[in-house]
Structure formats: C-alpha cells, structure tokens
Amino acid sequence: MADTAFYTHGLFLKHKMGNNNPECPKRLEKIEELMLAAGTSQFVDQKTPPMVAVTDMLAAHDADYISYLSHNSPKEGLNTISVDTAMNPYTWEAAQYAAGAACAGVDDVLSGQYKKVFCAVRPPGHHAHRDHSGGFCFLNNVAIGALHAIGVYGLKRVAVVDFDVHHGDGTSNILGGRDDVLILDGFQEALFPYAHIHHAPPNAIYTPFPEGTEGIALRRTMDEVWMPKLKEYRPELIMVSAGFDAHREEDQAQLLMVERDYAFL
C-alpha cells in the first residue's frame, strides 16, 4: 500500500459553469495526464470519496445556505448563484463529494492509514463563506475538513496553509478567530476577492505579495515566517489549499512562481 491517497470522482468533471470559465474540468484532466506521464500514479492509492455528511457541512455553513444550494440545484442548464458562480445539474452533488474527500482524507491521515492525502476535486472551496458562495466555490472543503478533524477527533491544533494566488476569504470567514486553528495565507495583493487583507483574524497570518513577485519571495516567507510559526504552533494536522495559479503562465494573475517553487512548497 502506498503512503499517499489520491481522491477524485467522475462527477468533478461534469460540474461546469459555462464555456470559457477558467474553473473547468481540464484542470483535473491535466493533473491525471501529468501523473500518468510522470509515472507517479503508481505511487498513490486512487480512491473515490464519500458524500460529505450533513453534520460536517453544518459545522462550517449555515443551515439556510445549505438549503438554498440544495433547492437551487437546476435540473438542466445553469443557475446563477452569485455574480461569478453558477450551478449545473451536477454541481451540488459534486460539491458534496469534494467536501467528502476532505473529510475522508482527514480520516485516512488521523487513523494512520496514510501519511498524506491529495484531493483532486471540483468545485473548489476557499472562497465559500459560512452563508454564501463566491469565486466559483460552494462548500468550503478545507474548512469542513478542519472542523471534521476538530469535532470528530478532538484535535486542538489544526494548521491551514493556503498558497493559492487569491486570498482564501471564505476560509478566514469560517475558521477565523478559533483557538484550535492556525491560518497561513499567501496571495497576490489587489486581486480578487479584494478583501480586507490588512485586518487578519488573530489566528491568521496574511502574506500579500505585490504584482511581479517571484517564487523566491514566497520561499523566503516560508522559511522566515511560516515555518517558525508552524514549529511554534506544533500542529496535529496540516491542511493545504493548494492552488497553483500563482504560476508565471497564469493569465489571470501576475505572480511569477515556477515548478521548482511548488516543489519547494
């Protein structure tokens, strides 16, 4: 058995928000293509996630919001949920499997079955707030997983690391202010979601990078800020919102990370 589990589901490829949307099935297709080409597929156990439990959803999101998503799932076509976020007939079910992957991954690690887990899921989650969607996100997968670890296993110190080019505003909305969570969030400043990035919750460290920042700056932040804080915090579990859109070839952002920077992370 491998020491890494890899979660994905066929429904993740069926969730679509219209033509030319950057959050598209090709994101996951490319991951699996590259894993096969590099030969890394043989070193992971591929698993299908369960659907998230209602209790886990309600730990992170308001009941009215969950009901709203359920009742607004369309039978055909697209239903716009917020200015940039829409559902097709597969979205709601896919979102529940995506959050279920986060919880199953937590179970796998905390039970000792695996050392680490990668969840290749769609829709993403870190812009989903307690009571509303946004930024292509419906359920906050990492927040649901973190609260699952706390609620089910009694963890006292969970670290959430977010290196997506966009600030994880939804994650801070749900987990901000908790004594049992540490949030480390590095992102491009003056970019969506244009949040109040200079007013971090007491349990969060925000590291905004100006346009044109190269990967060496993020590496330095990891060495000089994040790693000392993690060592001081002594997390029982580390969860990562692993967005790779700070890459220099990303059209919708202006950071300049390259492959070796992500390998370092």
What are these regions (language model features)?
Residues 1-161, 165-265:
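HDAC/HDAC-like amidohydrolase catalytic core signature
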